[in-house]
Amino acid sequence: MKRSKAYRAAAEKIDATALYSPLDAARLARETSSTKYDATVEVAIRLGVDPRKADQMVRGTVNLPHGTGKSPRVAVFAAGEKAAEATAAGADVVGSDDLVARIQEGFLDFDATVATPDQMAKVGRIARILGPRGLMPNPKTGTVTLDVAKVVGDIKGGKINFRVDKQGNLHIVIGKVSFSEAQLIENYTVALDEIVRVKPSAAKGRYLKKVTFATTMGPGIPVDPNRTRNLLEDAPA
C-alpha cells in the first residue's frame, strides 16, 4: 500500500524497534499527525486472552476525565416518560418501534445506544445490525437502564465502551491531537486502569502484550506495556 509523503515523513521520526514511554508516545502522536484536521488519538492494545472462551471476554466502560474530543451521537430506545427524559438529557435520536424500523432501513447515524429494559425485545429484532458494530445495548455496560438521563449524560461527557475483538485486540480513543500531553496521558491511565481491573481470572500469562498509539491516518507508535504507573511525572499541563 502506497503511503503519502506526510505519512512517510512522520514514520521516519518513529523508531519501530523501540518501546516508548506513554508520555513520549503522546508527544510523538501530536508531532507526527499528518492530517489538516484535529486527528483522533487511538490506542490499540493486544491482550493475552482467548476471546473465543466466554470466561476470557474483556469488555467494560470507562469515564475519560477529558472526554474523547467528540460529542458522540446517542440513540435511545424508550417510550413515554423515559423518552422525554432521554430527549431532555441530550439524546440525539429517541424512539421505539419507529427507531427500530429506521435502523432496519439503514439508519445508523449514531455512536452509542441506550435502552430501557422494556424495549429490549424490540431491540432484539435489530441485534444482527447493532451487534457487529458494537452498538447493542447491554446490561453489563450499563446501557440497558431506567436511568436513561444519567447514562446519556455520561456518554456525552466522555464515557466509552471497550470490548476485545476476536483477535484479542482492544481499541480505545483517548482524545484529539489538540489535547495536551497531560490530558492524553490522564485519559490513557484511567482507561488502562479499568482494562487491567477487569482482567479475567481465567486469563493466564502476560495480560498486556502490546500497546500502540496512533493518530488518524498516522503511523503506529510502539509503547512499553509495562509502563502503567507514574505516567504523568514529566507531562506538561
From Swiss-Prot:
Q: Which GO terms describe its biological process?
A: regulation of translation; translation
Q: Which GO terms describe its cellular component?
A: large ribosomal subunit
Keyword annotations of the record:
Repressor, Ribonucleoprotein, Ribosomal protein, RNA-binding, rRNA-binding, Translation regulation, tRNA-binding
| Keyword Disulfide bond among record annotations | no
Kindly give the Pfam families that the UniProt entry links to this protein. Ribosomal_L1
Question: Can you tell which superkingdom this protein's organism belongs to?
Answer: Bacteria
Look up the signal peptide feature and give its range.
none
User: Can the keyword RNA-binding be found in this entry's annotation?
Assistant: yes
Q: InterPro entries attached here? A: Ribosom_uL1_bac-type, Ribosomal_uL1, Ribosomal_uL1-like, Ribosomal_uL1/biogenesis, Ribosomal_uL1_3-a/b-sand, Ribosomal_uL1_CS
GO MF term list: rRNA binding; structural constituent of ribosome; tRNA binding
User: According to its UniProt record, which protein family does this protein belong to?
Assistant: Belongs to the universal ribosomal protein uL1 family.
Task: Provide the function of this protein.
Answer: Binds directly to 23S rRNA. The L1 stalk is quite mobile in the ribosome, and is involved in E site tRNA release.
How does the record describe its quaternary structure?
Part of the 50S ribosomal subunit.
Annotated protein name in UniProt: Large ribosomal subunit protein uL1
* The species this protein was found in: Parafrankia sp. (strain EAN1pec)
